[in-house]
Design a protein with these regions (language model features):
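Conserved SGNH/GDSL esterase-like catalytic core that processes O-acyl groups on lipids
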Residues: 2, 19-129, 136
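Short, solvent-exposed beta-strand-terminating loops
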Residues: 88-105, 158-165, 209-216
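Short, hydrophobic/glycine-enriched beta-strand segments
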Residues: 2-8
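Active-site segments of SGNH/GDSL-like serine hydrolases
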Residues: 121-124, 137-183
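Catalytic His-Asp segment of secreted/periplasmic serine-dependent ester chemistry enzymes
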Residues: 160-256
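Short, amphipathic alpha-helical "lid/cap" segments that border enzyme active or binding sites
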Residues: 73, 131, 135, 139, ...
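A structural motif corresponding to the C-terminal end of an alpha-helix
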Residues: 36-43, 130, 136-155, 188-206, ...
Length: 256
């Protein structure tokens, strides 16, 4: 079996060690690697932290001067049996706005907040047009993956739940309106995956539904809380090692 993995940081695992590709901020313990190990499969891991649907479909992702990744879809082998996709959060500016708000709350004078501020001046509201556009883009990736590998089973893997109904960060006191805005983005992302699966006929593994009790602030979290260390802060509100293991396990079940 050959698996090709597409996606952004929720698939890549930006701060999990060991590191598979430093420029891509990709871990060798992310869910694609764990899935391949569990199934005894070969893996082409194309995930890159910070990816958008555009950098998966048709635009190079520039990491730094002289460092870039071609559109991920171009790397899908024609012989792939399974293609997984977890992306879209960056298109909605979900985690980026959450991290920026966390820094503003945690330490308004911190340099990190000033660095992130121009990119994320506020928490965006997901209007119907934006959600529809994201749904269409996810469906386009499914079509493109099938074009690259006609026999592949394309699987949409949505996002682990970051904020459950009663979630509270232990380090950041988000305002109720901020939490509501983040949940609106989270709900929009889940809906886009659900509708894209229906529209494209791709399989959906809804890890969001299975992780409601493992959100930030839970007894057994599958996502990190805010990480105030600037060297590791990119891992804030991202899957933990346990979260990646859980996603891989759900995929193993879903692929049977």
């Amino acid at each position: 079996m050959l698996i090709a993995a597409l996606g952004s940081s929720f698939a890549a695992g930006p701060t999990l060690k060991p590191v598979a590709d430093r420029a891509a901020m990709r871990s060798s313990l992310n869910y694609p690697h764990r899935l391949a190990t569990a199934l005894g499969a070969d893996l082409v891991d194309l995930t890159v932290s910070g990816a958008t649907i555009g950098t998966i479909l048709d635009t190079a992702q520039v990491i730094a001067p002289g460092v870039q990744f071609p559109p991920q879809i171009d790397g899908v082998p024609p012989t792939a049996d399974v293609v997984t996709l977890t992306a879209g959060g960056n298109d909605l500016r979900f985690i980026g706005s959450m991290l920026t708000t966390a820094w503003r709350r945690y330490d308004p004078s911190a340099r990190m907040g000033a660095l992130l501020g121009p990119q994320y001046p506020g928490i965006p509201a997901p209007d119907p047009e934006t959600i529809e556009a994201l749904t269409g883009l996810l469906a386009r990736v499914v079509t493109a993956a099938r074009r690259r590998s006609p026999r592949a089973r394309v699987v949409l893997v949505d996002y682990l739940t970051v904020l459950g109904p009663g979630s509270r960060s232990s380090l950041v006191d988000f305002a109720p309106a901020e939490l509501a805005a983040f949940r609106a983005l989270q709900d929009a992302l889940e809906g886009a995956f659900r509708d894209a699966a229906t529209r494209s006929g791709a399989q959906l593994v809804a890890v969001s539904e299975r992780s409601r009790d493992h959100a930030v602030g839970s007894a057994d979290p599958w996502v990190e809380d805010f990480v105030p260390d600037p060297r590791r802060t990119v891992g804030s509100f991202h899957p933990t090692a346990a979260g990646m293991a859980a996603v891989a396990e759900l995929l193993v079940t879903g692929l049977r």
